Amino acid sequence: VVFCDAGITCPSGTTCCRSPFGVWYCCPFLMGQCCRDGRHCCRHGYHCDSTSTLCLR
């Protein structure tokens, strides 16, 4: 289990991400990169594009 904040958890092997509105969500990747839109994320070693819909290396 990964502890995000204030009792919010995500499954092991995932990453906690927080949306701009303060809502936590679980990125399905270990050490994932959270996108600014608060809904998407990328694998470790990749980053989100400006639209937060594509992952770039």
UniProtKB/Swiss-Prot annotation:
Tissue specificity field: Ubiquitous.
Recorded GO MF terms: cytokine activity
Keyword annotations: Cytokine, Disulfide bond, Secreted
Matching Pfam families: Granulin
InterPro entries with a match to the protein in the record: Granulin (IPR000118), Granulin_fam (IPR039036), Granulin_sf (IPR037277)
Similarity comment: family membership: Belongs to the granulin family.
Protein name: Granulin-3
